[in-house]
């Protein structure tokens, strides 16, 4: 698979120009933040655009950040991570301040974002229109946090529990349930036989060649954002349908991620259909996880963590200098991944990271 240079050049030119316009609008005087997007030519686009993101591929295989992002519900592979699977919480913790969306310029419709309404700017060429949305809850690249965050262990199969655990212990030594689970009121298989396969639930078509799917019915407890995740050790491509409309593919191709279902009226009934594809002939998952985010509690946590940021006075690719004030015992938390070669100094004295 290859693309013409003209296509590459147009995409990169528009991307670089959009990032340039973001930086003209926001000088980031209050800190260092990340810029991401929900469309990808490659996972290394940010490097080509001159911005900072979480999408990245490297043959050096820094496994720790890949697994960290995977456990938060993002797209991942052996050597890469991709900005797909975001939530309000993960965007805040990772300091993702702006998110870019892409649409067709011929339609002349500004593309929307599932999470954010604050439109910073649009940019276009003859084929595409890009829209940039601002995340009002983005945290700085480093800030003071509770020491109990050092004891946080992220599990493999529930990114909502992981985000609850991480955000809770950034704020204090007490656990807070920001994401709350929604029970499935009905499970409706259509031409699908259920069986057990180790720790997994397995569905296969009863009659091959005919439509085979599993429908999950839930009710929205509040008008807050609702998310979904299906953990599995056996990734077989399926199609997802939200209220009968196509939502996305799932599992294969880096698609075992948190899916944003949206906001609904309180007590509104929501249908999610998982369609088994004819070539795979099965689907296996350990659990069906539906959660909503208590947005009021989440915003309170963000407000607390913003009280003691690292005030950066000098920043480059390999050097960061700043001051931070701690009004109690704690740790300075940063989402810059640790690599051999970094040196940390506190008040001029070398310190070991924890």
Question: Language-model features: where?
Answer:
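Extracytoplasmic/lumenal acceptor-recognition loop(s) of multi-pass membrane glycoenzymes
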Residues: 2-7, 23-94, 139, 301-304, ...
């Amino acid at each position: 698979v290859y693309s013409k240079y003209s296509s590459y050049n147009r995409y990169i030119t528009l991307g670089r120009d959009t990032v340039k316009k973001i930086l003209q609008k926001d000088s980031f005087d209050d800190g260092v933040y990340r810029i991401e997007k929900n469309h990808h030519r490659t996972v290394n686009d940010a490097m080509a655009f001159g911005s900072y993101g979480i999408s990245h591929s490297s043959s050096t295989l820094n496994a720790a950040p890949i697994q960290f992002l995977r456990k938060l519900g993002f797209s991942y592979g052996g050597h890469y991570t991709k900005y797909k699977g975001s939530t309000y919480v993960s965007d805040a913790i990772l300091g993702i301040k702006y998110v870019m969306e892409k649409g067709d310029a011929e339609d002349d419709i500004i593309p929307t974002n599932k999470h954010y309404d604050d439109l910073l700017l649009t940019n276009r060429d003859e084929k595409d229109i890009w829209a940039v949305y601002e995340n009002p809850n983005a945290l700085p690249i480093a800030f003071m946090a509770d020491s109990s965050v050092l004891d946080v262990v992220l599990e493999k199969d529930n990114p909502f529990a992981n985000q609850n655990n991480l955000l809770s212990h950034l704020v204090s030594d007490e656990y807070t349930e920001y994401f709350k689970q929604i029970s499935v009121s009905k499970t409706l298989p259509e031409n699908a036989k259920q069986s057990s396969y180790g720790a997994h639930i397995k569905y296969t078509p009863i009659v091959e060649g005919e439509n085979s799917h599993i429908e999950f019915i839930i009710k929205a407890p509040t008008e807050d954002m609702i998310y979904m995740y299906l953990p599995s050790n056996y990734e077989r491509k399926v199609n997802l349908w939200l209220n009968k409309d196509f939502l996305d593919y799932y599992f294969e191709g880096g698609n075992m991620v948190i899916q944003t279902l949206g906001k609904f009226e309180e007590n509104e009934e929501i249908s999610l259909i998982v369609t088994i594809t004819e070539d795979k002939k099965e689907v296996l998952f350990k659990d069906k996880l539906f959660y909503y985010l208590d947005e009021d509690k989440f915003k309170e946590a963000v407000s607390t963590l913003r009280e003691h940021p690292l005030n950066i006075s000098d920043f480059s690719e390999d050097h960061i200098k700043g001051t931070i004030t701690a009004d109690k015992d704690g740790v300075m938390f940063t989402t810059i991944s640790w690599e051999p070669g970094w040196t940390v100094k506190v008040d001029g004295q070398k310190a070991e990271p924890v």
